[in-house]
Swiss-Prot record:
It is found in: Cytoplasm. This is Quinolinate synthase 1. [4Fe-4S] cluster binds at residues 86, 171, 259. Its cofactor is [4Fe-4S] cluster.
Length: 304
């Protein structure tokens, strides 16, 4: 089927199913273009709650679909590619987290939304890269357990007086972005601003002109007087950057800055999910209720 025919059929089924399509910025360009809403993890969580559709088709990885199912239990949540798991989310396990909690009984668990529903259920509050600092600083404690990303934990630790007890996880895509990659790109494009995601290594963030979530990176590039930008995150964001500020130039930091899991969803799989209503994301109710408490606490935190 030609792309135009795929798009037409998806649009028809979307109306028939009363469905809404949500996509992360790291998805394929054609998937972002057909989505009703494209955003970062925080915005997508908020949008899942706002939408009054019967069906949410989540173009992203498994934990994103789970978050939508947790927050909107009466809606049917579809994940076009059921095997699109997040490697970082898989780096933390429930039993290991329970043992860490036993070692630090006074420290609440702050879980990055890039985690499974089971991990969220073991957490006091969730966070995203857009609100991690505000979430941690909102807690009236001296120390927190932060899972699963050690790089985001280090970024938060540099912006709070609280002791951060990190889990030893990381995003493989961001962790592969090296300091020498940045220095080479800066030498090649001396006028370009380097904007980076806080999942990057600390020594990479030291070189950044601005550190932000994907949405924050887009807003910075759009509002900056600079004309060129080196992009320190998954290169799918460049599509969103071009749409927000097409007159500017963007350079992908590295050929390795590509998340295979985020690229698994394509138009064919999106169509199949709507046609067959397949790959429904479900979360056991006992887990869902506990995980929702952590997500609700996050959504109540005010972000500057």
């Amino acid at each position: 089927m030609q792309q135009a025919d795929l798009i037409k059929r998806i649009q028809e089924l979307k109306v028939k199913r009363n469905a809404v399509i949500l996509s992360h910025y790291y998805s394929r360009p054609e998937v972002q273009d057909i989505a009703d809403f494209v955003g970062d993890s925080l915005a997508l969580s908020q949008e899942a709650v706002r939408q009054d559709a019967d069906v949410i088709v989540f173009c992203g990885v498994h934990f994103m679909g789970e978050s939508a199912a947790i927050l909107s239990p009466k809606k049917t949540v579809l994940l076009p590619e059921i095997d699109s798991t997040c490697p970082m989310a898989d780096m933390v396990d429930v039993e290991g987290l329970k043992r860490l909690k036993e070692k630090h009984p006074e420290a609440p668990v702050v879980s990055y939304v890039n985690s499974s529903a089971a991990i969220k259920a073991e957490s006091y509050i969730c966070c995203t890269s857009a609100n991690a600092v505000e979430v941690v600083n909102s807690l009236d404690v001296d120390e927190v357990i932060f899972v699963p990303d050690k790089n985001l934990a280090a970024y938060v630790a540099s912006r709070t007086d609280k002791k951060i007890i990190p889990w030893e996880g990381h995003c493989p895509t961001h962790h592969q972005i090296l300091r020498e990659d940045v220095l080479k790109m800066k030498e090649k494009h001396p006028l370009a601003k380097f904007i980076a995601h806080p999942e990057c290594r600390p020594d990479v963030l030291e070189l950044a002109d601005h550190v932000a979530s994907t949405r924050g990176m887009i807003m910075y590039a759009k509002n900056s007087p600079a004309r060129e930008f080196i992009i320190g995150t998954e290169c799918g964001l460049i599509h969103g950057l071009h749409k927000a500020a097409p007159e500017k130039t963007y350079y992908c930091i590295s050929e390795f800055a590509c998340c295979p899991s985020m690229k698994m969803v394509n138009l064919e799989k999106l169509l199949a999910s709507l046609e067959k209503m397949q790959h429904v994301v479900t979360v056991p109710e006992e887990v869902r209720v506990r995980a929702k408490e952590a997500l609700d606490r996050m959504l109540a935190v005010k972000v500057k």
